[in-house]
Each structure stands twice: as structure tokens, then as C-alpha cells.
Amino acid sequence: MLDNPKLTARQQQVLDLIQNTMARTGAPPTRAEIAAELGFKSANAAEEHLQALARKGAIELVSGTSRGIRLHSETLRSIHAARSGPSGAGNPGSSPWVLPLIGRVAAGSPILAQEHVEQTYSVENGLFQHKPDYLLKVRGMSMRDAGIIDGDLLAVQATREARNGQIIVARLGDDVTVKRLRRTASTIELLPENPDYPVIVVQPGEPFEIEGLAVGLIRNTMLM
């Protein structure tokens, strides 16, 4: 747990919940989810704590989206320091992660093909609960309400498997997209987090692959 003397115990609980949810799902919780998890009477109570955290510089609130919560870089560094112990010395995993930044993906090419790598970034070891394999530059606003907006860098763990409700990187035909996965007995749907965008229904026989799982979100200001 991040020990920040500026925060009340309740604010610390909210901050820990945000960080843990982002590490587990790749997206921050909604106000309603915070209220339900911490036993608040309403989402308004959660909003009051979020506003206090924003005033104290622990988070940034993005208007117009239910998941518009971002951890500031100094908060992330403090969480990392707390995980590493008081000195961080002698930790064999203390070297930074060197991750390729993937830009536009050409049709039919593997995501990690060299021509897609714009540059590499060093990211603090342990910043996320699961080590990502690459960073994917987000284009567009289809995942806005999950707090993922144009220009963000999505931390992705390469995998072919995902559970319902997780945010994935999917290849559908020649296109690569970031969406929330929903599977039923008969269908696969890729859900946007923005009502202005349609649900993508994977048609029978249509080429579809899960390329990766979102394990976190960072911005350029959070990078070393």
C-alpha cells in the first residue's frame, strides 16, 4: 500500500483500489464500482474522495468519462518504491523494462514486426502487476469511457487468451483494434467504451485473433 501522509485513511483506500484495479484490468474503476467496493452510500461519495485526491496531486480526473481517472507519475513511482522495499537494493528484478512502442500496424503483419516499432522506452520494473511485452499507441476515442484516449500508450501482455470483460488487442481481418471482449455460446463481440462507436460482432468464419491483453495504461510523462 502506498503510504502518503497527505492522504486520509479513506483517501488512501480509494487510491489503492484505483491502482489495484488498473493493475488487474488495465482500466480504472468507475465511481459506482469504487462506492460498491468500499461501502460508500453513493457514487457521489466516491466522487468527493476522487476530487480530494486530485486536489492533492495523486490523480488526474478526465471529464466526460466514467473511468476518467489517471495516476500521476509521482504516485506511480511511490507505489513502485513501496513494492520494492525501503532500499530496492538486491532486487534481481530491479532493472527497468525495455519495451517497444508499436505505432501503426500494417495489414497482415505481426504486431511486433520490426517495421512497426517506432522506438523503445524504459519503464520502471514493477509498474504493473503483470509485465507487458510492448506498448501500443492508442488511436481514436472508442475506449474513452474506460479512460483510454487517443495518444495514450497501452501496456500490453502478448497472449492468445482472455476472459470476458477484459480489454484486449484483437486482430479482425486486416485490422487491429483495442476493445472489451464479450463471448457468448454463439458469438464473439468487441465492445467499445464510447456510445458513439458500434459494437463489433465477429462473423462466423471471419479471421479473428486475440493478440494481447491490456495490463495498464501510461502516458509519455510517466516514462523514465
Swiss-Prot record:
Chain positions of site Cleavage: 107-108
Pfam families in alphabetical order: LexA_DNA_bind, Peptidase_S24
Active site: 142 (for autocatalytic cleavage activity), 179 (for autocatalytic cleavage activity)
Molecular-function GO term, any one: DNA binding
Reaction(s) the record says it catalyses: Hydrolysis of Ala-|-Gly bond in repressor LexA
Family: Belongs to the peptidase S24 family.
PANTHER family the UniProt entry points to: LEXA REPRESSOR, LEXA REPRESSOR-RELATED
Function description: Represses a number of genes involved in the response to DNA damage (SOS response), including recA and lexA. In the presence of single-stranded DNA, RecA interacts with LexA causing an autocatalytic cleavage which disrupts the DNA-binding part of LexA, leading to derepression of the SOS regulon and eventually DNA repair.
Name by which UniProt lists this protein: LexA repressor
Organism: Verminephrobacter eiseniae (strain EF01-2)
Gene: lexA
